[in-house]
């Protein structure tokens, strides 16, 4: 089972989904795809709630970028797992979370106030430029690993267990292969 949301929800639908029962179990079995390996990180600028801007192509080093939304239940489940991953892999890869919420800081700031996610940035793309760069709107969550040159290594569509040892191995192995080192094992995500 693949747990995911689409980016096409209207504002009213987004608010309804955000109020969904949080006790609902989410299957964390995202799908790893290498179909877009080698593509450059999108030329998109995101903002944070304070108005700071970040051009994604200006980010240095390897990046694990997660496109999510507050109304996407699988995304919400993933956020604490990504926060833990960001802490564990600090200095190895930069974890960027980018919200696709249409209302931007109005809903993103309260989300971060509610959940303790000290290792995750609060980037937003309320115009959905990033989603459109991924061919008009991917399923959410979408997590893409980029190497130090800003080239895609792989992407995972749907919710994934970022707290697992295998998740850390997937990221580290992919980055070591990109750096020219031989991998120890084959990727375990299907």
PLM regions with names:
Residues 2-4:
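C-terminal motif of bacterial Sec signal peptides marking the signal peptidase cleavage site
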Residues 6-43:
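N-proximal helix/coil linker or "cap" segments that precede and/or mark the start of modular domains
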Residues 6-7, 178-190:
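Non-globular targeting/processing and membrane-anchoring segments
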